[in-house]
Each structure stands twice: as structure tokens, then as C-alpha cells.
């Protein structure tokens, strides 16, 4: 055993070293958590957790997880000579809807985000045929890319969105909307906030970590697809009413409640980050609904958002007589 005298440890110096280590770990964690691929994985699992947590399974509700990504679904339809030969058709229609004793699906909830390109619209068309055959609506999502923009903030700045959607880029989209099976497709937007950034109000527990986010943008925050919020409202409606139709309006089952509100310092006080990618005006919400989308609108100065409508992608038929329309 050494008889060398140990100098007194400087506690402040040691605390400083520990603080620097925490800072280095925090920077590494920021890079991981804000990586696009990691965000997609975390968003998916937290969205599933959100739906499971909001579902009362004592109300005869079942959730089935199907492990398939968007590209695999595209390949499934491309490899099949026709839709009825696809694996999705077999699983949803043949194995359940068309089999005695089977348990038909009420709806298919997906995290998939669609754009207005040929590949995605071909996929939506194939899915709509399966959904129509099994009377099982399919829910997907659209983002800024659908509208040819980089962010949803740019989308809400489109002045005449009805005229904008008549551009040549949306010929396939408008053709799809005219199809009969389009009534079995629902596309939601924008996304909602899944969790607060880690820090004082959402501590990690094992060490001091303050997640670095820019409150003026949306990139570093963790967003969830609105399909899962709508699905949670559907399960709640089924529990309370025995069916899934009470899912619209603040008093009619459309609320998405208790959303996280992040407050950040802007130098002259605290600013609140709304739990939605963008704030939709009533006029914009109505316009998007009439264009075949299901908008999730944040209720200003509150902690909830709301689905005011639940339109399918199908374009309503117009007749000479108003009552017929």
C-alpha cells in the first residue's frame, strides 16, 4: 500500500468536470434524438404507445400491429398480377372479412406519408380497392411535400389553395378523388407534438440533460402522425357509443386533449410552442377539408387540438339540384 499523501479533492473542480461530461453527452444525445431516421422510429413507437394508452380494451376493442413499411406495401401490389392477389388483400379481406368466424377490421391506421407523385397515388389507388372490398377505411397522412413545399408553415401561406390544387401536378390526385373507392381513404394533417423536449419538465432521471431545441422552428421536436390521434378518438367513440362516428367537433368527439405545451425563453419572457406543426385558421381548415383532407386544428390558448371534419378523399358529386348534391 502506497504511503503517498492524497491531496484534498477540489469539489468545485470535480463538479465542473462532471458538468462538462454532461454537456458532451447532451450534445451526442441531441445528435441522435434529432437524426431524421431516429425521429421516425421514436415517433412510430410513441404514436403506438399513445394509441394503446388511449384505448380501453375492456370495451371489446382489439388492435393488431402489422409490421410492414410503405415500400414493402408498394412491392406487394407491384408483385401481384392484380389487387386480389396481394398479401394485404388476403390478410384484410380473405382471412377475416370473407371467412366465416373471421374478425373484420374496422379500419387500417398507418403512419405512411403520401405525396402527389405517381408512385404514391398508385399505392393509394390499390389500397382503396382493398379497403372498399373489406369496407375498412384506410387512414394515411400528407405533409408539406404533398403540396410541393418544404414545411407546413409554407403550406398555410398558399393564398388560394383551391386554385393551387388545380395545377397540372395534381391531375392524378384529382382523378383519384373522382373514383368510387376514394371514399375509403382518409388523409390527415398536420402532425401533433408527442412529447416535451427533455429537461426540467421532462427529466431523464439518470443525469442532467437539457435537450436543445429551437422553439422558432419545428425540426428538433418529436411529432406524431395525426392518424393516431384520429384513431384514438375512434376507439373512444366506440367505447362510449358503440360505433366510431362521433369523432368531429369540440363537443362531438373531435378533441385531442392534454397535448404537451413547451415554453421556451425568447429573451423578453416565455413563448409557448403550440402542440401542432402549424396553426390552421378556420377558413384554411374548411378549405383543406373540402379538398379531401382531415385537418387537425389547434385550439388557440389551450392544450388541445380538434378534428372539425372527417372527410374522405373522394370529391363530392355535384348535381344541378342542390338537395341532390
Give, region by region, the residue ranges found by the protein language model.
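Structure-specific endonuclease nuclease cores
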Residues: 60-71, 76-91, 95, 99-106
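N-terminal-proximal low-complexity accessory segments that begin disordered
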Residues: 1-78
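Well-ordered, non-membrane alpha-helical segments in soluble/globular domains
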Residues: 44-45, 79-93, 119-130
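A glycine- and small-residue-enriched flexible loop/hinge signal that marks low-structured segments
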Residues: 1-6, 33, 56, 68, ...
